[in-house]
Structure formats: structure tokens, C-alpha cells
Amino acid sequence: MDCKLHQKRIASVVCCLLLAIGMQAQSNQEWRDSLNAINQQIERSPYSVGLHLRKAAINLELQQWEFAIDEYKSILRHDEKNLTALFYRAYAYTHMRRYDLAKNDYNDILLEKPTHMEARLGLAYVYQLMGKRNDALDLLNIVVEQHPDSVGGYVARASLETDMKRYDEALYDWEECIKRDPDNTDYHLSYIDVLIAMGRKETARRELNKLSGRGVNQGALRGFYQRMK
């Protein structure tokens, strides 16, 4: 069982859900050009929250965490309940490993909006990074309860359960992921991974054969077959 693989998957899920800035992919130079243009606009409209949010978003794209945090602080001085600023400041704090500050921002969001899925996922991820996996699992249980139709909560919870070797629960959650997105090969492989960890190799082999029959790349399956020898 590759714990690092599951930790990376958790991070991937959270990042995809968190950093939904809605901006097009650009090169670093293009982002820098955009940043210069935004700075010029801010000079003309220094109190525009929208412009400061856009500038901070570009800072995030360039991984300029401190600059982004400064922008969000500026916004929050005038509007302490700006959820967007709190949300992405927490994201930046997480990248800087300032977990207590990230936790505080996510909690402030949840006080205002208890059903904010991305904030709760972000908080759960911070708890995992802090080594508080049981607390993280409690949060993910709430995410799934509040958003039963969203695959993201199930993926995050299943990944953590797998990492914690809570295989019965993980197997159920991977099944739920597959129900919601049956064409996602990664979910099927994660399900098979848990079956192998549980010693259910024949069931795992049947599932692998199904994937092979669907044309899934053999390179992705080879390691799983080898684990069952």
C-alpha cells in the first residue's frame, strides 16, 4: 500500500476543488504581463476589491504566496467577512506551511457558511498535514453528509481511509466514487488497490480483467497484477 500515493491523491483532489480561480492557463511571462496590467488598473482604482482579488489570484498562479497574502489582508481590513479573500489566503497559508493561520481562515468561513464544501475540504487537508487524521476524517464525514452527490468528498474520504488502513470504509467510498463517475479509471484502480490490501485477490483480479477488457493501458495495470502473484 503506497501511502504517499494516497496523500498525493488527497492533495490533488483538494487543489482541484480549492484553486478554482477560473483563469486560463498561461506561461509565467504571460502572468507577469497580466500582473503589470492589473497593477496599472489598481493605480487608477485603488479601492477596487475585484482588482485586488484578480491581482492576488495572479500572485497565486506565480506562487508568490506572501504577495497574495498581503493582497488578501488589504481586502480583509476593509471587509473582514470577504469569504473569497479568506478562502484563498488559507490556500496560500497552507502552501507556506502556516497551518494554524490556514485553519483559522477556514474556520472563519465555516462560521459564516457552514455548508461551504471547499472550505471544509481545505480544513480537512490542513488537519492531515498537521497529523490530525481523525479530526480530518470527522470533517470529511460532514462533507459527504452535506454534499452526498459530490464525488469530491468521497474521493478525499476514501483516500484518507485507505491511508489509515480502514479498508472496509475505504472500499465502500471507492464504490460510491465509481457510481458517480464510472469512467474514471483512477477510482477503479483505487478500489482494486484496497481489495489487494484486504487479501481479496480473486475479486481484484476480476476487476483488473474488466479494466483490461475496456482497453485500459496495460502499463497502468501491470503493477497490480504483479502484486497478486
Could you tell me what each predicted segment is?
Residues S12-A20:
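Bacterial N-terminal signal peptides
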Residues M23-E66, D70:
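N-terminal leader/linker segments that initiate helical-solenoid repeat arrays
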Residues N28-N36, Q63-S74, M96-D108, M130-I142, ...:
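Structural signature of tandem alpha-helical TPR/SEL1-like repeats
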Residues Q29, A197-K229:
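Terminal, low-structured helical/coil segments at or just beyond the last alpha-helical repeat
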Residues V49-G50, L83-T84, M117-E118, V151-G152, ...:
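Helix-start (N-cap) detector for alpha-helical repeat units in TPR-like alpha-solenoids
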Residues L60, F87-T94, Q128, V155, ...:
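Position-specific recognition of the canonical hydrophobic site in helix A of tetratricopeptide repeat
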